[in-house]
Amino acid sequence: MLQPKRTKFRKVHKGRNRGLAIGTDVSFGTYGLKAVGRGRLTARQIEAARRAMTRAVKRQGKIWIRVFPDKPITEKPLEVRMGKGKGNVEYWVALIQPGKVLYEMDGVPEEVAREAFQLAAAKLPIKTTFVTKTVM
């Protein structure tokens, strides 16, 4: 599972997921899976989508993961009263804004890439779309 090796602080504030996306263009591969909605992806969801894509292309071509879960999410244990400090870090998430390219793929036909991204999109909680690299 993806998570940072080191962080400056163990826990962070909840914050808000606003603003515009960085990394909106397909830059490494030929095809991409772009987020249409706003939300957050857990490390487990990112890995599940990657596995689905890898199996769909039968380990051909190359896949790039363009998102990284760098925000720790804390939870308190079950049946624990409020107070007594912030909970323990349970999982890591990546904040996603509309327009962000989540995955890229190269070295496979377009139909295969579309099918693989469709399987990956089913594992993700946000709406996505298939995009291709635009040459200028």
Curated annotation (Swiss-Prot):
Superkingdom of origin: Bacteria
The protein, known as: Large ribosomal subunit protein uL16
GO aspect biological process, one term: translation
Subunit details: Part of the 50S ribosomal subunit.
Gene: rplP
A Pfam family that the UniProt record links to this protein: Ribosomal_L16
Family in the record: Belongs to the universal ribosomal protein uL16 family.
Gene3D superfamilies the record matches: Ribosomal protein L10e/L16 (3.90.1170.10)
